[in-house]
Amino acid sequence: MKRIKQAGFTIIEMLIVVTILAMLAGILVPVLEDSQKSARDARRSADLKTVQVALEAYKRENGVYPSTGGSWQGDAPSYGGFGYDASGYIPDLVPTFIQALPKDPDGSIPVADRGYFYRSNGADYKFGAHKTPESFEAGNP
C-alpha cells in the first residue's frame, strides 16, 4: 500500500507559531503606546509655542494680553469648558491672531482634567497643558 504524503502543518507547529506571535505582540504594543504618548507630547509642545507667538502678536497690537479677569479658562470641563470647539478659552485671539485654539491631541477629550488652560490679567499670562507630559510615568518627570 502506498502512503500519500499530505502537505500542511501539524497542530504543534501551529501552536508554536501562535505563541511566538503572541509574545511579539506583547512586546510591540507597549512600545507603540509609548511612541503615541511621545507624539502627543510633541504636538502639545508645538501648540504651546504657536499660542505663545499668537499671544505676543496680540500684545504688540493691543498693548495687553487677552484678559480673562484673572480667572482660569480652558477647553477641559475642569477649567470651565470654554470653547471646546477651540475658539473661546483665550478671548479675542481667534481668528485674527490664530486660526483656531489648539485642542488636546488625546482623542478621549473632553476629560475633566486634561487639556489646555489660560489665565491673564492683561499684564501677563499663564498658558499650559494640564496633566502632561504623558510620556513620563506619574511621579517621575
Regions found by a protein language model. Give the residues of each.
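Aliphatic-rich helix starts adjacent to a transmembrane/signal segment
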Residues: 31-50
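Short, low-complexity, Pro/Ser/Thr/Gly-rich segments in the mature regions of secreted, periplasmic
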Residues: 133-141
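Amphipathic alpha-helical segments that mediate coupling or scaffolding at interfaces
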Residues: 14, 35-38, 58
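Extracellular/periplasmic head regions of type IV pilus-like filament subunits
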Residues: 56-129
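N-terminal single-pass transmembrane signal-anchor helix
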Residues: 2-32
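N-terminal cationic leader/targeting segments used for protein routing and processing
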Residues: 3-6, 122, 127, 141
